[in-house]
Amino acid sequence: MHDDKFVVMMICSLKVYKGIPEFLKIAKQLESNNHISFRLILNSEQNEIDKYFQNQKFENIEIFSKQKDLEKFYSTSSLVLNLSRVDQWVETFGLTIVEALAFGIPVIVPPIGGPIEIVEEGLEGFLISSYEIDKVAKKIAELSNDETTCINLSKNAKEKALIFSEDLFLGKIQKVVNA
């Protein structure tokens, strides 16, 4: 919780297959939960975003264009979503997932591709298809009211992120070079 808000963030390209329609539906479904807010950061210019949404208004969603510094967004988020459509786009890695974990932010990610190598169900987050909108919304609502689980997920997220640290990678490369 940040300022009594459970902030759900998604960072992605302005592409339908990245799950933007699903994100909007989930936010709409949770609109009556005043303590939950949504943040969508798109890797696009503002004019492209304006054209895509054509002046739609969202009660509980803040939409941002391309950002140079994401730290301020991560540091004020409670949960990060990756809603890539499992039948249209398979994440091979998922940099935003690892970044979220490094900030100690739990994640909800697709149950295929790279994310399943990063996230263990129930430890750092949850593996749920973006097409399971009700299930994602229910999990968000549950987490927003369960501080203990969020604290445990956050601790596990930070620990998992260490596996992807630059120092660890450099150490492994040095071992190979020196072998």
Segments and roles (model prediction):
Residues I49-K68, L79:
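Nucleotide-activated donor-binding/catalytic signature segment of Leloir-type glycosyltransferases, i.e.
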Residues F6, K15-Q29, D134:
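A conserved mid-protein helix/loop that constitutes part of the nucleotide-sugar donor-binding site
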Residues S75-S77, T96-P106, P110-P111, E121, ...:
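Conserved donor-binding/catalytic loop of nucleotide-activated donor transferases
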Residues E120-G122, F126-I133, A141-E147, L162:
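Conserved acidic donor-binding segment of nucleotide-sugar-dependent glycosyltransferases
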Residues T92-I97, P115:
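Short glycine/serine-rich donor-binding loops of glycosyltransferases
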Residues I11-Y17, S37-D50:
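Glycosyltransferase donor-sugar binding loop
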Residues K135, E142, T149-I163, K172-K175:
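A short, well-ordered alpha-helix in the C-terminal region of glycosyltransferases
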Residues S75-V90, I105:
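Acidic donor-binding loop of glycosyltransferase active sites
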